[in-house]
Amino acid sequence: MSVVRPKKVFQTPIDPGVSLRRKKDFYIWAATIGFAQLWRDIKAFKWYRPLQMADLASHYFYIPLGRLDPRILSSAPNDRMLIKTIPHEMSQDYDETGILGCPGREVVNAGSNNYGGFTRFEYGSASVIKLALRNLPFNPAPEELNTLVEREMADYMEADACATAISGYGANLLAFLTVAETAKLSDRQCIFLLDEESHSSMFVGAFLNKEAKFHRFKHNDIADLEYKLRTMKETSPNALVCVAIEGMYSLAGNVAPIPAILALRKVFNFCLLVDEAHSFMAIGCKGRGSFEWWQARGYECPLSEVDIMTATLSKSVGCTGGLVMANKIYASNLQHQARLQREEGDECLSTIVLFRALTLIRKPLFIERRMKTLEEKARYVAERLDEAGCLLLSPPGSPIICFPVGTVQQASNFVAECLKKGFAVACGVPPATPIWSCRVRVCIFATTSWGDILALVNTLIAVSCKLRIDGVQSMKFDTDSLPKVSIKEDIVSDEGNAADLALQEYVEQLAAKYPAEDCRAIAPLNVAQAREVFEYGVQSFEMYGIGASSVRWFYGTFDVFIRLEQRLAGLYPSLISHSGKCRAMLGSDANVMAVSLLSAVAGPMYAKDVLNLVLVPQNAPCYVKKGATLDKVQPSTRVTLYEDLRDLEVEGTKLQKHRYYHVTLYLETVDEDGSILDLSNRIKDILLTLKNAPSLTGLRLILDDSRGLGKIGPRHLGFLDQMESQHGVSFFSTALGPQLAAITTVVVFGSWFHSLNHQGGYVISSEAFTEAHTVSSKSFVFSTPPMIVQAAMSEKTLELLAGGSGLV
């Protein structure tokens, strides 16, 4: 009896294998990149000395790879945007050279996550944002505004409760914490069962809850999920099992099998956590994600079946921030955990982000039209690419269209070729994908014109043929292939205008109670300086919108970010005197940055015989301690949370077993009571307690200046500003002594929220450390950067505090 093979349409798309020749080409290409970086080091008389195991790959591959074809964006991330063309001879140092003088050109944007096209502000929504920027505190937002957004968002998503978070990354951390605490309250073991292709933030969220167990199941594999659920029911019958999935997966574009998962839920009664980061305002008739996607296909998938749902405002909505929705018992626990975080002084969403959320969800008819338009355009692109023989990993109608290209080299070449033709697309490469499963990632926007959609399809096919992507045949489509009828949005203009007018009136009502120029909100600026910063924010908004809509590593960066990072890098002469050339990096969420920073520096050292001793005070912020203890215990690393110096005496005794050790020390520059760190004596006391100084190979000093910047120093520029005024630019040599200073790496970390009432965080350190950390930091690699508006306002504030000086 012959076997009937299923047709292609019934097969699950998988990444094809990579030929031996292409693997060989990749290794030669990777070696070329590494040797080119080595030659640049030699010409600059530099000898790179890696401090940790991961640093070598960062310096010789990931950093130069990311700078082969850098994208510097100088307009809003709309469907068409302006980018700077960086000459190849200066691309490896693009953030240190005169990028503003480089020529710019307009390209079609198919690389960011602006699926709904909401970076183009509809009707009167831009007026609402500008009014809020000028008349209300930037951050913290009025509490009643935050409460209103949480209530209306819960209603829109048909949830019992909603809590806001500073980032989508932070939203997942809060969601997993809520599940773990719910299990603890019911005296049950918590077990997280995650889809293996879930977001990095979901894995981090699971890892941070140390009392919980953690397992993976194969991507979208219902049989594997059922097997693991049945096993857990037999081995841990009383456990609270949480199945965590994404609604739509960003590096495949496929949607989770929600109907099948809900069927399993009826049998095993597990908690269901769904991350709708890429599907919120991207799929579903009302933009509510994967459940609506399946409802439109005839399945009964009520949103009430979700126990916890996370979403982000950083992607399709075009801002920065996250949302956590919850039902039943998880709703009250979510509100409790969110309240605890606020009481501990956590950041909160800025006023303009909250108003942008309101301007959107109060226009349900407008959203419905956008979602229909988006699916129509996404389906057209997918069908044409499929017709040309492209192996799509995403289903028709998904706004993320992914197809495999094999190696990192092929992915990099594909992106570069598209950019030459005027189209910006993205790619998925390690660590986000397996080494031989790199993908091209094309994002469809509802606002992209049909002419650009057609040109995009033809470009993708042409580049695929040029690079010999398996299965793709040469084809060119014309306007006759386009749908005859497109959806118009003008019929919902009455709804949009009325909603925005009501919100403008609400801004004015709030401004009477919470004026923007309140002394506490604008400190350390005076009223005139604050007005200048507000107007600079308005100008930035008019040019860039609010948010970046995508991750820098996979998409590109904005000239605004580079200017702020350059200013931060030159802010402290004492740090430059000690470290040499400095660099800075930005993040949208200071807490998440702290987790990533401490997790990265707690890794093993490059020298195998050196113990990395990480010392963190017990009174350090919660997220600092969680980051330091995030990863599994390794024999080459020891993390110690100490109350006082007596705890370190025990640690000093243990050090006798090790020939060499390196100390990573976290210190806050200003305590809660306002006392300023005596760095010299603190270091001396700690090293004296360890009693093994001759074996010390190095010191990494992490100075948390969150309570310093904007508060202390003659220019209100923080701890180092204060120390430089007292000890000069040789402060570190004086405080540490020349011998210890020579082996010390200084890292300055801070929160814009606690210092300037802005949003997000920053890191400043030596060029070597900062470059390596742009790869080792999970928050930098996988999280959306800060709001462009906020970065511009922070840069202007630093300029004013520094006395109006230009870039150092």
From Swiss-Prot:
**This enzyme's EC code(s):** 2.3.1.-
Pfam families xref list: Aminotran_1_2 (PF00155)
Q: What InterPro entries does this protein's entry cite?
A: Aminotransferase_I/II_large, AON_synthase_class-II, PyrdxlP-dep_Trfase, PyrdxlP-dep_Trfase_major, PyrdxlP-dep_Trfase_small
The entry's keywords: Transferase
Query: Which pathway does this polypeptide act in?
Result: Mycotoxin biosynthesis
* Gene Ontology MF terms: pyridoxal phosphate binding; transferase activity
Q: EC class of this enzyme?
A: transferase
Instruction: Tell me which Gene Ontology terms the entry assigns under biological process.
Output: biosynthetic process
Required cofactor(s): pyridoxal 5'-phosphate
Family membership noted in the UniProt record: Belongs to the class-II pyridoxal-phosphate-dependent aminotransferase family. BioF subfamily.
What does the record's miscellaneous section state? Answer: Gene clusters encoding host-selective toxins (HSTs) are localized on conditionally dispensable chromosomes (CDCs), also called supernumerary chromosomes, where they are present in multiple copies. The CDCs are not essential for saprophytic growth but controls host-selective pathogenicity.
**What is the role of the protein in this entry?**
Aminotransferase; part of the gene cluster that mediates the biosynthesis of the host-selective toxins (HSTs) AAL-toxins, sphinganine-analog mycotoxins responsible for Alternaria stem canker on tomato by the tomato pathotype. ALT1 also selectively transfers methyl groups at the first and the third cycle of chain elongation for AAL toxin.
Q: What is this protein called?
A: Aminotransferase ALT4
The source organism is Alternaria alternata (Alternaria rot fungus)
- Recite the lineage of the species: Eukaryota, Fungi, Dikarya, Ascomycota, Pezizomycotina
Query: Which gene specifies this protein's sequence?
Result: ALT4
